[in-house]
Amino acid sequence: MENDKASHASPSIGVNEFVVQGEISIDDSERSVKSVSVSISDDEDSKTDVQDNMATPSTRSKFQTDLAIDNRLLEKDPKYKKLFTEKRRRRRPESCINLMTKGKGTGQKDNINDQIFSLRILPGSDLNSLKDSLWIIKISTQPDVEKTIARAFSDFYWLYHQLQNNHWGKTIPPPTRSNILVEKDEFAINHLFMIRNNEKYDPIFNFKPEYIISLQLMAMIKHIFNDKVLRLDSNFIDFISWDDDLPESLQIVVDDSTFTGDKILMTSSQFRELKEFHKQSKKVESITNSHASLIPVTELTEIYISPTKLFSRKDYQRLFQPQSTDNTFNNNDPLIQEWIPKSKTLFTSLSFGSSAPTYQEASTEIQACHDWVSISKEQWKQLLYHVLQYIVDEAVKVNSVINEFTECLKQISLDEVIRANSELFLKFSKLNESFLKKFKGASRQDILKLIILFDENVRFCESFESILNQRLKLGKILSIIEVDLDKKKNFLDKLSPGNNNSNNEDLKIRTAEDEYRIVLKRYNRVKQSWEKIMEDILNERKEFEKREAAEVNSCLKSIRDLNMDEKKHYLQLWQDFVPDEHISQ
């Protein structure tokens, strides 16, 4: 593993400390934490998965007592009957949206599905350190109704990995790992333009890093909003600090207009809310055992399979809770070793040891997905670079022609052979200058639309690689359990034929049967997750291919229409210019 991963782990950390310390609280009294993202089954036979990150309340509270309710009291006053019989709901403070919509009748409720959400993300600090930078998120649903919160850049990565833990097989375009679109590498727009423009830098094409990063972050949040499963995730709702229920079908509009680059100062209330969110996110991460904040930002394809989600509650306790007074358990168990830090890191590695069985992907469809995503990722990178080359080359070419023509007109006007003609040439040069300015602005938007779309697809491929790694990891764990299951079955078969009906032999058989039954349930549970994630991966690929075709066509159509409008505008300037000159003469 890389050095930046190693920095997160202590060299002396034990396996029992790694799995048990702070990762999950078994005490029922400690479970009632807001926005718990994982529900661990209380029953060994239960196979319920995590659904929408709702915490499973304990069947009996520690301080619960049996209190008899006097029926006469209930009949005496309806208020008491309502208090003791109806389910109590948690009361949330009324948000600004509730205050605006309160008292408007049922007609407002009928239009909730047609609500349009506007999203805007602005820098809240300097980008000296991208990981520690602050960003202001503005979400508005109606005029004068706006929710403004502050989040650190690392919080977007926390959200990305937390949602990955909550929803195996779901792709989410991650935040940018660095200023990849503004650095001097093969994707550098500014550097590319400088080369095409004979090293002359034009400030109009100055793509500020904070602007490009804000577009990338907005693309990520927009994707989550558009996913009917992800947007209802309680961790995402906590991330955007939304108090009301999100509509089932909403429209999200991204405000991609340029900004001056001045940072927006946080208010004291936003700062307090940010600190509270960080505390809450740590609790959620500890309970769900997701390691969302521990995975390095440079590893977008790195994954961590939470054992608290994979196994049932009793099975998790059986595997990872210490069974002796020395606070240790069997470190040599191949299944336990899958969660032991490798190379002094806290992350499960896909480089498997020789003692564990080797997992080979049996599904031809998943193998095809591996080949497809590697080719698709490289193609999107190349397409991004070539499209940038073409757009920048064309922009520089037209820019140069118009500049030369304008300078020529200015030079002719300075000769003043005929004063009327000189004024005409001067006006015409100003006309071309105004058109050139609009042309540069339009070209800039063309570039931004394409690079954000293509870059989002590149990052989608990286997210797709991560869910393929989830499938690999689950397959590896399934192979280990399958070997253990065969051993338990063979041992049970050896005991059964030689049974002489003695008490000792009966005890051995019952013990072997219990162990076999436990491992069989574990195998079926993991296999169910392993098979389900394959269906999710195939569906994600189909959805992406359908979505990318529609988005690329829409983007190119928008650019084509914009260019047509610019040409019409330029012709209109010509048509208006000639009659005006005739009138002035």
UniProtKB/Swiss-Prot annotation:
SMART domains reported for this sequence: PX (SM00312)
Chain spans, region Disordered: 27-59
One GO MF term: phosphatidylinositol-3-phosphate binding
Disulfide bonds: none
Pfam families reported for this sequence: PX (PF00787), Vps5 (PF09325)
GO cellular component, one term: cytosol
GO aspect biological process, one term: regulation of TORC1 signaling
Anything else known: Present with 1270 molecules/cell in log phase SD medium.
Name the record gives this protein: Uncharacterized protein YKR078W
UniProt source species: Saccharomyces cerevisiae (strain ATCC 204508 / S288c)
